[in-house]
A protein has these predicted regions:
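Carbohydrate transferase catalytic cores enriched for Leloir-type hexosyltransferases
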Residues: 1-357
Length: 357
């Protein structure tokens, strides 16, 4: 009988990250905790993080600090889910690297730039394997880091079954079902909120509005005020976000760069018509389930939004395309692929092989 695989996971961001990356990591962790083939240790340096982890995940795991990963026989494999490798480790390591935007679109401030780039650079140099989300992101990693050659694999995410069509949702009082364009996660420049704000200002009428989940940066917020656009920013729980997806007239993803793009797939799974940029990984991710547009073509965005809001059969056709795209995905593929990669790493390691003897 095979020994239990001693899996350590960098847990630093679990208490803070509940967005796409955090949701994916939680699914992997919960699956590993429920599988007797794994003995899970969560690595967290801060006491406050350790308390938060116990509150969320109970007593089913061991707890340790990151320094324990440097001991040669402490673990059979270490997983770094947070887009980089924060510390070194002696065991075989898998780093999930969603993107390298810290290098292609570096922060203007030197200290912040180094803080964002250092874990990615360490991953490229030291990780045993790197898992990324798409062909596009793999190519970006390999073009940026020669050291990553030969160790990058694709483990594509998919929305969990939580994201599904339904009815009976309660929306915020200022939001009218079917009468809004939804934008999720807009603070970063590459999210390109500017194009959508200008398009909505030209296209929306009457009680129609732009709803933003996750907030805008100060420049984009000023642009909304100058345009006179009816818009609202909402801090949404997963339950509220699902309700907003289900009832949106259109979900818009105008990003100029995405390593994958989970938002359009979540929206499709919930039955929303999706309009997305034709840039970076989004054509690969949406797979024919979205209307794709040049991210800088404001008139085309305005025209497309107006047509979808005015033409229910057109919107219904786009919904059907979205459902078909999601149906073709392996909804558990990211979790299974990540754990299989970790098993392969461990079973090739001499320490794990010694324990088989």
């Amino acid at each position: 009988m095979s020994p239990v695989l001693r899996l350590a996971i960098d847990a630093a961001n679990f208490p803070r990250d509940r967005r796409g990356m955090g949701r994916l990591a939680r699914e992997v962790l919960r699956t590993a905790l429920a599988d007797p083939a794994f003995e899970v240790t969560l690595l967290a340096a801060k006491r406050s993080d350790a308390r938060a982890l116990r509150a969320e995940f109970g007593e089913r795991y061991r707890a340790a600090g990151p320094l324990s990963a440097r001991k040669r026989r402490a673990y059979d494999a270490v997983w770094f889910p947070w887009n980089g490798m924060r510390f070194g480790c002696a065991a075989p390591s898998l780093v999930t690297l969603h993107d390298v935007f810290a290098f292609s679109e570096p922060h203007r401030e030197r200290i912040a730039r180094r803080r964002e780039q250092a874990p990615i650079l360490r991953a490229a140099r030291e990780a045993t394997r790197i898992a990324t989300d798409s062909t596009w992101s793999r190519d970006q990693i390999l073009a940026t880091f020669a050291a990553a050659s030969g160790k990058v694999e694709i483990v594509a995410p998919a929305p969990s079954t939580y994201w599904s069509a339904g009815s009976g949702d309660v929306l915020p009082p200022q939001v009218a079902a079917g009468r809004y364009v939804l934008l999720v996660g807009a603070r970063e420049k590459r999210k390109n909120a500017r194009t959508l704000i200008a398009a909505c200002a030209a296209a929306l009428r009457g009680d129609e509005s732009l709803v933003i989940v996750g907030g805008l940066g100060p420049e984009d917020r000023a642009l909304v005020l100058r345009s006179g656009l009816r818009a609202g920013e909402i801090a949404a729980s997963d339950r509220m976000l699902r309700a907003l997806y289900r009832n949106a007239g259109v979900v818009a993803v105008p990003s100029t760069a995405e390593g994958f793009g989970l938002v359009p797939l979540e929206a499709m799974a919930c039955g929303a018509p999706v309009v997305a940029s034709d840039a970076s990984a989004l054509p690969e991710t949406t797979g024919g389930g979205a209307l794709l547009l040049d991210p800088y073509d404001v008139p085309r965005w305005a025209q497309s939004l107006r047509r979808l809001l005015d033409d229910p059969p057109r919107a219904e056709d786009l919904r059907a395309r979205g459902f078909a795209r999601v149906a073709a995905l392996d909804r558990d593929g990211f979790t299974r692929g990540t754990l299989e990669s970790l098993r392969r790493l461990a079973t090739r390691d001499e320490n794990f092989v010694d324990r088989l003897a």
